[in-house]
Amino acid sequence: MALRPSKCYREINKPAYTRKKYIRAVPQPKVVHYVNGNKGGDFPVEVHLVVKDDIQIRHNALESARIVGNKYTQNKCGRLGYKFQIRVYPHQVLRENKMASGAGADRISDGMRLSFGKAVGTAARVRKGQKIITISTTPENVIHAKEALRRCNMKMPVKCKIVIGKGAELVKN
């Protein structure tokens, strides 16, 4: 069955459901690497992508943002000129009670009986002001880090802002 739209899971309107003991099979998150680039490098400047609202971000949105941001940063800064880090983990289990529609659906569907639903994915719960992605780099590459985070922002289901954390005094506006 097709993937439901993100708006179905965006709001935080239920308690966190991270208990995997009662669920038969939870799909693995699509995010494969949480740290990219020069993992051991010590860079003087950090640029963050900060969320403006409380929201759930699905694992496939995090992965697509990682791919876009990492590829752009790697092309502009080189393989060892940056450190790209996703700072949230998708713990929240997303469930879907599939409903049959069409001819004969009443004979197939259970309706609201046993409506716990099957696990269809995971999401990260983030709060307003939380940093979700950080790029550490040199002062010369800050403009590229900002552009990479702007591209990551386009993949997110929420408005975000780009903030320079550590090393703001080294960066020329």
Curated annotation (Swiss-Prot):
Gene Ontology MF terms: structural constituent of ribosome
Organism per entry: Methanococcus aeolicus (strain ATCC BAA-1280 / DSM 17508 / OCM 812 / Nankai-3)
Protein's name in the database: Large ribosomal subunit protein uL16
InterPro entries (alphabetical): Ribosomal_uL16, Ribosomal_uL16_arc, Ribosomal_uL16_CS_euk_arc, Ribosomal_uL16_dom, Ribosomal_uL16_euk_arch, Ribosomal_uL16_sf
Source organism phylogeny: Archaea, Methanobacteriati, Methanobacteriota, Methanomada group, Methanococci
A Pfam family of this chain: Ribosomal_L16
Protein family: Belongs to the universal ribosomal protein uL16 family.
Entry GO CC: ribonucleoprotein complex; ribosome
Any one Gene Ontology BP term: translation
Keywords: Ribonucleoprotein, Ribosomal protein
